[in-house]
């Protein structure tokens, strides 16, 4: 069903449609012709089962993506022992990854124009697999740095391209859930893959963990090439007629919008927390809380379970409420921003907690509430730009997000080295992350409004598809 977001009468009305009155007067136009779409098919005749199957394939690549990131945290202590590394050096490696990850994110739009999604994602996945192998052959600090720099550069464009591919199969009003599943790939990776990598590391050595990740990437490429096809909702590579129908918006106007700026600050601050969890959670669990190495490698699961549940629940609720006429600002800005505020309060209290299991619970719940920003803010930012500019807009948005990962792991290593005990250092680092995220969430609550910015940046935008009466 199609819903027009134009205000007033006649804007977007057409035969077979009816006006729906919102709190500020006529706000929506419901297309009853679209409502008659056969069961199992979407507004543009696409198979919904096929759409979700291909979305699952994209999520599986994101699981590999996050496993490649998380493996450094899992093998950090064995690497430290074998290569004689300090906490600051491990943190530096984690941050350098996000340096090239940030740079790579700016190439998402270019890749989307130069290559089809089919081949651009294969290229990236092959690069990830190749990045795992140098450390297997020659283990040294220099090789570790270079391999992580290359991995970061190759992973940088992936998030925007994966979201673009997923959004191509889902109408705008129903994108929070597929976005949540993509964001939830981090949790799936830490719940299902990280414990397996921990077992491999403890049983066979850290090199075999890297080999397993490389093999997983190669297997995914074979499946992808035999199944993927582009969806009907977003142009990729060669633009479609429907995408061409809406004029492009100046890039500077998109990037200067208050929704984009404050949204980028929030996701950057939360991604700083994510990157510290990826790099340091096993070390915090082992050195700071006294758990065994195998237990510490499995600790990824706890914050990830909470994060995955909250992301999926909030995204399902968001899609359903927006389909029924609720505002995008309330569901995609206010709700996740309040979640970040809750996270900030919990992380601020972490240094005062002396019981290991309570510390794990606080960190897990705080992480879970903060993680809800990713699918919802991504959907909000995609809303303010024309379809042909989605990959480029999300590429820059997510590249800015990755700056949090550039700074936070190294800063955490410095704090831990300077602290009286590892436990005190890790807790202080998480406290600082909570304060910064809470401040950024307040800015988004005050300034971000995707509906306002969509109306200003996209005056000729077509009706929002995918809503139901």
Model-identified regions with their sequence ranges:
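Juxtamembrane intracellular "pre-TM" segments in multi-pass secondary transporters
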Residues: 38-47, 231-264, 288, 464-466
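Conserved MFS/SLC helix-loop-helix module at the cytosolic interface between two early adjacent transmembrane helices
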Residues: 103-139
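C-terminal ends and interior cores of transmembrane alpha-helices
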Residues: 126-139, 337-354
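Cytoplasmic helix-loop-helix junction between adjacent transmembrane helices
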Residues: 147-187
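Helix-loop-helix hairpin linking two adjacent transmembrane segments in secondary transporters
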Residues: 182-231
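A membrane-interface helix-boundary motif in multi-pass transporters
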Residues: 202-214, 292, 331, 414-435
